[in-house]
Swiss-Prot record:
This is UPF0181 protein YoaH. Coiled coil: none annotated. The lineage of its organism: Bacteria, Pseudomonadati, Pseudomonadota, Gammaproteobacteria, Enterobacterales. It comes from Shigella flexneri. Belongs to the UPF0181 family. Pfam families: UPF0181 (PF03701). The gene is yoaH. Signal peptide: none annotated.
Amino acid sequence: MFAGLPSLIHEQQQKAVERIQELMAQGMSSGQAIALVAEELRANHSGELIVARFEDEDE
């Protein structure tokens, strides 16, 4: 699977990690927290996008 992802600088990545940790500390599951932060990043990001390839490991 390929996805267009925001290209983030280190500071933005660090803030995203901190936001995920904050949400998890409030009781949200890690998957939900990651999905929410990813959605927020996509909605607010105005810079470049990178293409990433994800492989399903269900096989």
